[in-house]
Design a protein with these regions (language model features):
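Alpha-helical scaffold segments that flank or form the walls of functional sites
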Residues: 75-76, 84, 92-146, 170-191, ...
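N-terminal metal-binding scaffold of metallo-dependent hydrolase/deaminase domains
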Residues: 1-63, 398-401, 424-425, 454-455
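His/Asp/Glu-enriched, well-ordered alpha-helical/loop segment
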Residues: 262-272, 290-396
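Active-site gating loops and adjacent loop-to-helix segments of metal-dependent hydrolytic enzymes
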Residues: 106-117, 159-191, 234-246, 250, ...
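Active-site core of metal-dependent hydrolases
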Residues: 184-312, 331
Length: 463
């Protein structure tokens, strides 16, 4: 995203303040360090003052007085994931309020996410009422991931695309043709923190709207669209530089009618979102996207819904019945996907095993690419001295499975075991075992109860 160097510096300072940098130095030791490129001869990282102070080539280099975490030879240190498309989780969505948003940010860190865009949507009138309050959370400490701004996914979408590709029987949505005045009103309510906007280019004046977004320093994204290949090209010419959950919410790729997906695959100007959970996009097609775009033009996202973190079972989103299966997808009664509940660490396991993407490239797609796209590439998305100490650590976790009929392959049990945000450890897997694990299970049950069938809600309430 375009922006002045002074703007980047201000954002840098604000983001680092979220890390509460005071405290003793911390050393993380592991078998592999990906910066995201393999760091040959590096065995660990020293974090101090909220940033990466230096890379360590020997365990004896840990300074006196530092907290040392030896995470084992199978552990991999990567830049913290930056998810530009996540709506919520654990029964909550960002517009539910401050406490809800903080809970989502805290829990998202448990899978290795250190920064994200709060993805929201609604009518312009709705958004101007609750965006100011949410904007208070941007770049503030949360005890988890840092909110880096907003991704607006709606109202400027063709909701009929949901019907065309099966996610809903009817959209039930009022259509709002793109209007620059509406955008600036919403951006003012968001205190200038809208970074990414999804829109469908088939609306009247949509191309002019895309030009307006681009000139305002916001990344325009094509999504939830029935656009023809030529219209998709026109949208890119107008300023589109991002594609919302590629292959989903758009015409299926066909060799005689490639649709928007075909244009996204072949235009190097566009960064393509990928939901790599194995359900939204088959691993073979994940590999196709990776080979067509390369690791520098793909951004990994969860598109995590409020049902993220829910166990398998049947739930109700209003009148709509949904099923969470062992692949952690949210499935409708007709067998169509209506969102993902898969965390980013499981997604990475799918991508690097079934999808065949090397870990160093997966780390680039999950951290470096979104950091650069958001104008944060000078201090986030890499593990090098001077950059923010935003680090995710992945290692084999006994019993971790992919589900969804995916094979058990070497690396498919790799999950997040530690997350550091601006030099502060906000999550350690071993700290949630035992009694804390039981307390968390009770918390999760309370969150999911309201979405159960009435008879199940009554039964669980009696327990």
């Amino acid at each position: 995203m375009s922006g002045s160097s002074s703007g980047h510096a201000a954002s840098h300072a604000a983001t680092r303040s979220a890390g509460q940098a005071a405290g003793c130095p911390i050393v993380l030791l592991a078998g592999t360090v990906l910066a995201p490129e393999p760091s040959v001869g590096v065995v660990g990282i020293l974090a101090e003052g909220g940033v990466i102070a230096r890379l360590l080539s020997d365990r004896s280099e840990a300074p006196d007085g530092a907290e040392v975490y030896d995470l084992g030879p199978d552990a991999v240190l990567v830049p913290g994931m930056i998810d530009v498309h996540t709506h919520g989780g654990w029964g909550l969505r960002y517009p539910d309020g401050h406490d809800a948003a903080r809970t989502i940010l805290r829990r998202r860190a448990e899978s290795g996410c250190t920064g994200l865009l709060m993805t929201v949507g609604g009518s312009p009138e709705e958004m101007v009422t609750w965006l100011p309050s949410l904007a208070d959370l941007v770049e503030q400490p949360t005890g988890g991931a840092v909110a880096l701004g907003f991704h607006i996914e709606g109202p400027w979408l063709n909701w009929d695309a949901w019907v065309s590709w099966g996610a809903r029987d009817s959209s039930g949505r009022e259509l709002f043709p793109p209007d620059p005045d509406d955008f600036f009103r919403i951006q003012e309510a968001a205190r200038g923190q809208i970074k990414l906007v999804s829109c469908a280019p088939e609306f009247p004046d949509a191309l002019r709207f895309i030009e307006t977004l681009s000139k305002a320093g916001v990344v325009p994204s094509i999504g939830h669209t029935t656009a023809s290949p030529q219209l998709a090209r026109d949208a890119i010419q107008a300023g589109v530089r991002h594609a919302t959950h590629t292959f989903n919410g758009m015409q299926p790729l066909h060799h005689r009618d490639p649709g928007t997906a075909g244009v996204v695959l072949t235009d190097p100007r566009v960064v393509a979102e990928l939901i790599p959970d194995g359900s939204h996009v088959h691993p073979i097609v994940q590999q196709l996207l990776y080979r067509a775009k390369g690791p520098d033009r793909v951004a990994l996202v969860t598109d995590g819904t409020r049902f993220g973190g829910f166990p398998q079972g049947t739930y109700y989103d209003g009148e709509r019945k949904l099923e969470i299966r062992d692949d952690l997808g949210c499935w409708t009664e007709k067998g169509n996907l209506a969102g993902s509940g898969s965390p980013i660490d499981r997604d990475l396991a799918v991508l690097t095993t079934e999808g065949g993407v090397p870990w160093e490239h997966a780390a680039r797609m999950g951290a470096t690419v979104p950091a650069i796209e958001l104008g944060l590439g000078t201090h986030k998305g890499r593990l090098i001295p001077g950059y923010d100490a935003d680090i995710a650590v992945f290692a084999p976790v006994p019993g971790a499975m992919l589900g969804g009929g995916l094979r058990v392959l070497p690396g498919s049990d790799r999950r997040c075991i530690l997350t550091m945000v601006c030099g502060q450890i906000v999550y350690r897997r071993e700290q949630i075992q035992g009694q804390e694990d039981d307390a968390r299970a009770r918390e999760d049950e309370a969150m999911t109860r309201q979405f159960r069938a009435p008879e199940v809600r009554e039964e669980t309430a009696r327990k």
